[in-house]
Amino acid sequence: MTGELTRREMLKAHAAGIAAATAGIALPAAAQPVPGGVEALQITWSKAPCRFCGTGCGVMVGVKEGQVVATHGDMQAEVNRGLNCIKGYFLSKIMYGTDRLKTPLLRKRNGAFAKDGEFEPVSWDEAFDVMAEQAKKVLKDKGPTAVGMFGSGQWTIFEGYAATKLMRAGFRSNNLDPNARHCMASAAYAFMRTFGMDEPMGCYDDFEHADAFVLWGSNMAEMHPILWTRLADRRLGHEHVKVAVLSTFTHRSMDLADIPIVFKPGTDLAILNYIANHIIQTGRVNEDFVRKHTTFMVGATDIGYGLRPDNPLEVKAVNAKDAAKMTPSDFESFKSFVSEYTLDKVVELTGVEAGFLEQLADLYADPKRKVMSLWTMGFNQHVRGVWVNQMVYNLHLLTGKISEPGNSPFSLTGQPSACGTAREVGTFAHRLPADMTVTNPEHRKHAEEIWRIPHGIIPEKPGYHAVEQDRMLKDGKLNFYWVQVNNNVQAAPNTQNETYQGYRNPDNFIVVSDVYPTITAMSADLILPAAMWVEKEGAYGNAERRTHVWHQLVDAPGEARSDLWQMVEFSKRFTTDEVWSTDILDANPGYRGKTLYDVLFKNGNVDSFPASEINKEYANREAEAFGFYIQKGLFEEYASFGRGHGHDLAPYDRYHDERGLRWPVVDGKETLWRYREGYDPYVKPGEGVKFYGRPDGKAVILAVPYEPPAESPDDEYNVWLVTGRVLEHWHSGSMTMRVPELYKAFPGAVCFMNAGDARDRGINQGAEVRIVSRRGEIRARVETRGRNRMPPGVIFVPWFDASRLINKVTLDATDPISKQTDFKKCAVKIVSVA
């Protein structure tokens, strides 16, 4: 590398400056896209995926003297083509906060563990001794259902896979769930219910082929800015291309919208049915496609809101226990069902102008226009999140606009490996790898065979999901709990009443593995210091099915260790006699006396690759600790679940040479579009389109109605609260709030409010207010200007700020099918602080 910049590099640097200026940030030298001069010659560069969202941007990571000193967009990465968003340009700083955790911390009093004690540094041996003692006591007294783990869409693939083995096969508990339950569960359930397989059929290449983009509950300009640049490039470079943006308030993505639609919260259900009706009434159903490739069903209605069973809304719900039921139907019945959603009715219900609704419907109905639908939390964090996901598939299936370049219903992802780890590995309470489930006896048997464990080890009943875990902790039914790579006391709904109380329940022992002292960590009994990002070898899977692997580039500080090391090392403290039932051991005496480490991780699969296979230019502390290439062993064992079943992954070593590959990877080739002949190797010549995840090869078109949210404004609590993110921060802010430039750009959460609403209440711009719900309250300053422009009766508060815990206010209602929380709709009142 020389000290000179090429014209291309200058353009990339200029783009970075524009992105930074948008956020009001000056790029320091450490964040420059391409450092130059003599200093650059002393930096070693290696590839890795970005640590933040699910876009999966490639970055080049610069290391000098054992520390990450710079990052820039990877110009060889197809996803981002050298660009990064403003968070990505500050990746070099996320690991170096001054309060980085470097040693285990245990609550102690008088030299021994005490629930009400103060945190004191301890050795790893003491930490694991106390941890194992607590786990064994709970297992002996209450059994496997009292042991649980809460993981993350930020786990590497190896970490998630190790967790699912440790919990399901080791402790025989399905009480494993990821924080992706809060963000992607509705999308995953809808994929499975519609296509029989999870994850998008398209890819990011669709951005260069679509003639229309429809954003449903997605502020891509701030939350997926790199993909937004690809969308904007297509829109601004081609006059015929249109953009529609639907939201409950006006945000930055609407600056590019040809069809800006602000609707009343929850009424997107009605809009989707109106569009389906419009397609049918105007005679633009692709009848040949529908006849050959779809089947019709009717969903159960009045399904409740996923609240506690004794909540009045659950008691009166007719089908709360059968929420997922779908009954066979036909096209004529579907036509009759959606015919009730007339333009006039939907205008009245949603508050949207008729002209905008008609223009939107015509985008989907026009047979000559390729449409890409995009959505994130506005759809998924919804008490009818599975429904709205399936309803957008209805539109693409009715018109045949699916599984080909530019015609793509595309669920965007919020975490770097919510797809690759939470969904593909199967760290949800009901799942196994490669779309298999614990409720299916053949799937359990298959997993037990791959894992080389006795039949009958994996329990058949799904475990507690994320919100239910909090409730069970509070109720004293879940007593040993290990949290990794998430900040759930800040992130969970109704956290003051349902989450924090469970963490501090004296009957429970809570372990949190993290890199910083988050609210969740400080609520625990034992804190384990974790390695992060390039301090370990890792693999992520992004939103377009792209698996990306990286080497360990630097060491973690102090005694911090990777989550993988922590789980595998902890498994050595248990023998099968302590965790498996007597009848299983009597039938399989060869397993007696073995440690879980021997059974799960030194099983002839995971330990089959010697450490000598690791690239000599890179460290691998886990391989040093265990004596074999554990990441490769875990990956190859995991990959055996999906090969030949439509989830094929390439050999592990190939990923080190690639900027990621999109599965299924068959005969060395990645798949860009699934389910269509000519693109997907699983679709045979002559089949055209085949949704092979379902036995009949047909996708489901589902009839479901508009139903109101769990809570709406009334005379006292007369404002809708919507929560979400901002450009500068990611999730709970535990990383980005420690980057000085990002903190200065947006130092604290504010209450975005309609100016007229503020005037009516005598509230000035910048004034402090109380945001009060039936569950709790916080204080924040009012913002009536700026990026988010609120309609009357709606406020928006981001949740990154630990000093303003907006989730003290939110409602713990969930989609009854997916169990995903609705963070977008609850009722509050705004009270001026005089």
Swiss-Prot record:
Its cofactor is [4Fe-4S] cluster; Mo-bis(molybdopterin guanine dinucleotide). It comes from the Bacteria. It is found in: Periplasm. Gene3D superfamilies: 2.40.40.20, 3.30.200.210, 3.40.50.740, Dimethylsulfoxide Reductase, domain 2. Transmembrane segments: none annotated. Predicted to be exported by the Tat system. The position of the signal peptide cleavage has not been experimentally proven. Keywords: 4Fe-4S, Electron transport, Iron, Iron-sulfur, Metal-binding, Molybdenum, Nitrate assimilation, Oxidoreductase, Periplasm, Plasmid, Signal, Transport. Its EC number is 1.9.6.1. GO terms for biological process: cellular respiration; Mo-molybdopterin cofactor biosynthetic process; nitrate assimilation. Belongs to the prokaryotic molybdopterin-containing oxidoreductase family. NasA/NapA/NarB subfamily. Component of the periplasmic nitrate reductase NapAB complex composed of NapA and NapB. This is Periplasmic nitrate reductase. It comes from Rhizobium meliloti (strain 1021). The gene is napA.
